[in-house]
């Protein structure tokens, strides 16, 4: 079995693969302060509930956009799993040709998503990832990572309304009953929900106009199902795209 770990700014997602099958997965709040021992105790609790033991894991692969966490995570892997983890970054084979001005600027999560999209859905493709930031990545018909778009995430915008507008409450992100709200909460939910649906469709349509052929659009991330089901442009919703990409990259490098 292999353990795949996707460390995002808001959430950390873990999965366990048995060959090609994702048999367990968990979503945790990202914590920058934990030691390797604290991480190990968290993972042990999850494993106990799933009937797993540390020695069941033969390999570990990590994608992270939070550098301060990496030392503790690496030490946890070595101390408790007796495994040196594979870290997505320079020197790791992905098969991806990145056409960014500076390829080092492309986040590990975006690389992993692109690899998964190519392998599972073909190319050209656009990957929309609803994370702390909402990212859009274009893989062109030459199988190249052609570039993308980065926008504020849904949670960032929602929290900004709450913190910067003194009379507006903190709200749950949900699809409202109708577009025109008749109270503050419904109106805010409508603005957030339909505003982001419209953002996705607008950005994707403009990216498609720049592409040389028609790309398939894949959505992933914590809010992919909520926004993706209302979108006119999203073709596939794959909540586990990043975990699948980590497993695919691990296979390419062992």
UniProtKB/Swiss-Prot annotation:
Cofactor binding note from Swiss-Prot or TrEMBL: A monovalent cation. Ammonium or potassium.
The name this protein goes by in its record: Type III pantothenate kinase
Catalytic residues as annotated in Swiss-Prot or TrEMBL: 109
Residue numbers binding substrate: 100, 107-110, 184
Coiled coil regions in record: none
Subcellular location field: Cytoplasm
Pathway assignment: Cofactor biosynthesis; coenzyme A biosynthesis; CoA from (R)-pantothenate: step 1/5
Cofactor(s) listed: NH4(+); K(+)
Record carries keyword Ion transport: no
Database matches in SUPFAM superfamilies: Actin-like ATPase domain
Molecular-function GO terms, alphabetical: ATP binding; metal ion binding; pantothenate kinase activity
One annotated Gene Ontology cellular component of this protein: cytoplasm
Principal subcellular localisation of the protein: cytoplasm
Principal EC category: transferase
CDD domains named in the record: ASKHA_NBD_PanK-III
Record's function text: Catalyzes the phosphorylation of pantothenate (Pan), the first step in CoA biosynthesis.
Positions annotated to bind ATP: 6-13, 132
């Amino acid at each position: 079995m292999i353990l795949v770990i996707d460390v995002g700014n808001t959430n950390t997602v873990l999965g366990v693969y048995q060959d090609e099958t994702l048999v367990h997965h968990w979503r945790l709040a990202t914590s920058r302060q934990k030691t390797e021992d604290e991480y190990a105790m968290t993972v042990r609790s999850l494993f106990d509930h799933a009937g797993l033991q540390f020695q069941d894991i033969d390999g570990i692969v990590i994608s992270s956009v939070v550098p301060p966490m990496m030392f503790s995570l690496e030490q946890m892997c070595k101390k408790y799993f007796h495994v040196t983890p594979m870290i997505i970054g320079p020197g790791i084979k992905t098969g991806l040709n990145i056409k960014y001005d500076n390829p080092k600027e492309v986040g590990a999560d975006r690389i992993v998503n692109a690899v998964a999209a190519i392998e599972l859905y073909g190319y050209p493709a656009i990957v929309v990832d609803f994370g702390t930031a909402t990212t859009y990545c274009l893989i062109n018909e030459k199988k190249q990572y052609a570039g993308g778009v980065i926008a504020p995430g849904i949670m960032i915008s929602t929290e900004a309304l709450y913190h910067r507008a003194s009379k507006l409450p903190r709200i749950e992100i949900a699809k409202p009953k109708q577009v025109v709200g008749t109270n503050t909460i419904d109106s805010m939910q409508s603005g957030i929900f339909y505003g982001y649906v419209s953002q996705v469709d607008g950005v994707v349509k403009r990216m498609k106009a720049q592409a040389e052929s028609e790309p398939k659009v894949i959505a992933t991330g914590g809010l992919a199902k909520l926004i993706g089901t209302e979108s006119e442009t999203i073709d596939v919703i794959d909540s586990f795209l990043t975990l699948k990409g980590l497993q695919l990259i691990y296979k390419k490098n062992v």
